[in-house]
Amino acid sequence: MGLVKNLSIGILGTGFMVLATAAQAKAMTLNYDRSIGSPGFGPGQLFVPQGITVDNQGNTYVANGRGVNPDGTPNYNLGDNIEKFSPSGQYIGAIGSGGTGPGQFDEPTTVDFNPVTGDLYAGDVHNNRVNQFDSKGNFIRSFANGDFTGLIPGRFFFGPSGVTFDKTGNVYVGDFNGERILKFTPDGKQIGVIGGKVGTALGETKGVAGVRISPVSGNIFLADQYNNRIQVLDPNGKPLYTFGSTGSGPGQLLQPIGIEVDDQENVYVADSINSRVQVFDKNGKFLTSYGKPALDASGKPVPPPGLTDPPFGNPLDLTPGKFNWTGGTSYKNGKLYVGDFFQGRVQVLNVEGRTQVPEPSSILGLALLGFGAATVTLRKRGQQKPVFSLDKELQKQC
């Protein structure tokens, strides 16, 4: 539990000064609320849910997986759309379809609404572009055609990754293998580039996955996937600091993908291979985590599917809080939406304890200051492209 002290000083009458320090902490917890979608290939069913977003009416939008035939060729009749669900989780319909034409997808990934314009933006991996729709799902345009770096040796991810927006509505899109973030106007004109160097130093990356701009500071938080860390940049793209390290302990990461930042700058990270979501404060202090690996009948973790297998774990473990890798994330109105990568669903979590919690105080001492007295009071309290089953190969990249 993080400890934050605030110091206040006030003059009471003539010569009296009161000093008060208030220690404040965040006792945050994540609790299961419900699931959206089910594993499968029909309407309202999901496979490899990547991008997730929620509109102002509480409807949930999920970027569904890429349909593939047994020989590896695209099957545009499966997935390749954005599934829409009501606030209660009922299937409403789909935006887009499989293909290469206007408004079509060949593997949608990141998806989010522009808070200024209300338009919906979605990454389109194999078509190498971003598709833009209005708030009702009507296609507007595609942009960034061919701007994203393709597949490179040793990696299983490529294309547009996270999408996020600044307070003026400009669009920032991660280029996973380009190790950079591309900046566009709301109508898709490129106006800037952030990053672009591969490596482990501050400001360098190994796979730009999720990207999110803080609604408070405007800082940019990005999931640096193969470096197993989060990088924080200022609004101009200047690197500030990183947090997280390789591993499975509290605050450690194995290939983080999705990332969210709420209105108090709590940072939610989909810690994919660890099959959980972790929460940090804006400085990278670990607060809490939620989720455990899906288990088979013998109690062993269920591995991700093989390259030629259906995109689901075998067996499925749909117990609340069990994941077969975590993927996309979205935060809205006290709830966190987390993609259950290889179990074809989105788990919705209640986020509790985001505010600072006061605790009982005790007077520790009284001292004379000049002609007055000072009372000291201390309150103390005492938290893209799918990955397959090649676990060892992937972890070599960590």
Each model region followed by its residue ranges:
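A short loop-to-beta-strand structural motif that recurs across blades of beta-propeller domains
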Residues: 80-83, 128-131, 179-182, 228-232, ...
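A short, hydrophobic C-terminal helix/tail in secreted or cell-surface proteins
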Residues: 359-377
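Blade-level signature of beta-propeller repeat domains, shared across WD40, Kelch, NHL, RCC1
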Residues: 322-355
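A detector of repeated loop/turn-to-beta-strand junctions in beta-rich toroidal repeat architectures
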Residues: 46, 76-79, 105-106, 127, ...
